[in-house]
Amino acid sequence: MARESRESTTLDSHSAEDQMELLVIKVEQEESSPLAEETSWLGSPGPDRSRQRFRAFRYPEAAGPRQALSRLRELCRQWLRPDMHSKEQILELLVLEQFLTILPGELQAWVREQHPDSGEEVVALLEYLDRQLDDTPPQVPDDDDGQELLCSKAVLLTSAQGSESSQMEPVEPLLKQESLGSLPSEVRVTHVGHCGEDGVTATRLTSELQGLLKMEDVAPVLSPRWTEQDSSQMNLYKDGMQEHSGSLVSLDQDMQTKVRDLPRAEEYRDQKPEQTVCFLGEDTVPIPTGAEASEQEGKLQAAQKSATGTRRFYCRECGKSFAQSSGLSKHKRIHTGLKPYECEECGKAFIGSSALIIHQRVHTGEKPYECEECGKAFSHSSDLIKHQRTHTGEKPYECDDCGKTFTQSCSLLEHHRIHTGEKPYQCNMCPKAFRRSSHLLRHQRTHTGDKDFFVPEPYWESQSRVESHWENIETPVSYQCNDCERSFSRITSLIEHQKVHTGEKPFECQTCGKGFTRPSYLIQHQRRHTGKKTSVTVTPAVHSEVGVQLSLN
């Protein structure tokens, strides 16, 4: 009894060691596989690779339970990417994986070759494949079409088998030795890349590893109507395949070396159609181009639209996509500069009709957006949103440097200039520059003396416009006094000087009643009464032409 116990213990230890050796071999094969080299070269594994690593992880690979749990969390994060994906996107990834898992083995592998991003794309691919196969009758292929038909069927099956082997998942035998016994054993399809615009990719199929084709196993997967054929029709089609099987021959070693250098399936999106060919024995079959390729692409887009209910329209200039063709047509006007909608009042043109409607409110005075709190109305919805923040106290725009918050993004941009020191608004008549356009306008009045001078803020965004604007304004070089012919560079200086001739002293001390021509003189005088530097309010005289009132700290 003890001997049997020792033997069982020895067998268990040997079994555990064998399992560990298998796991080590599997990990080494995984690390040395071309896909691992590819992912290490790219810097991070793709979604499919990350999912496989998460599913293939086993407890013996870790040093302990804590390390195993930590490793699982790391692999799961690499697969689902919670830092980039939302909860809905993560849920879609899990549903997509389960959807692919429940598909039949051959069909599942073919769908994985297409790299779908959602379950709706899987549905579109399956419905498209089923319609394509339903359009092909199960008849004996002619000499001209036999090779092409046989290649298309074999490509569908072998692409699935090649995908499963590359993903390191258990592969069920796709081809069996039980039927088509007369088919030569050297028959194989060599991987040559893209075989048509429908995204089907052929992969290598060796009869030594996978056996021969069995119609009874493959037909139900391709389309449900194959199961409705009687035995005579199945045998007839089988004989046709046997007759044309000789055309599927392997390429020589030199050609296989060249084939391995061809781009992968996902790179064919950027490859020109005329550069892609499908080799069949010694014949070269060009991929459909031009109108034929556009027709196939249109069928696939129609299938995707019928399955998902959506269709994307892409701009060739910038790649932006739209759900409706009208949106794409409107977007193209940005590149062409076309503005078909013109205002009848002022002649200003716009790209879209909605922009014209909003502009017309300037002329009509319409303000359809009303605040429910205070009843104030606005012509733009964005203005109403900004106004409502005054009631709610919301300040969504925060400065990264000091943490100060603002209700509008433009206020945050102006505030940033305090930290950066940027002063984009420069006076064209003197070296002074300002952070705000309003400060520039206020400063320009010291040169022109025009109190009503105003230019809208967006107008000053371009420095060239500022320069061209001031070139068109005729301003005197100096301001001359009519009494003594003294000249001044600023009109404010001239006004202060004229008080010398008129004897006007508009700034009066409230304590003793003494008057002064300048507010600075009054401030100095009031310090004699207070004996310290305090806040002083300077009030001009009643009949003063200047009318200056200021508060100094």
From Swiss-Prot:
One of the GO biological process terms: negative regulation of autophagy
Location in or out of the cell: Nucleus; Cytoplasm
Matches recorded under InterPro entries: KRAB, KRAB_dom_sf, SCAN_dom, SCAN_sf, Znf_C2H2_sf, Znf_C2H2_type
Name of the coding gene: Zkscan3
Annotated keywords: Activator, Autophagy, Cytoplasm, DNA-binding, Isopeptide bond, Metal-binding, Nucleus, Phosphoprotein, Repeat, Repressor, Transcription, Transcription regulation, Ubl conjugation, Zinc, Zinc-finger
Chain positions of all zinc fingers (C2H2-type): 313-335, 341-363, 369-391, 397-419, 425-447, 479-501, 507-529
Protein name, UniProt field: Zinc finger protein with KRAB and SCAN domains 3
Organism annotation: Mus musculus
Phosphoserine modifications at: 33, 44, 223
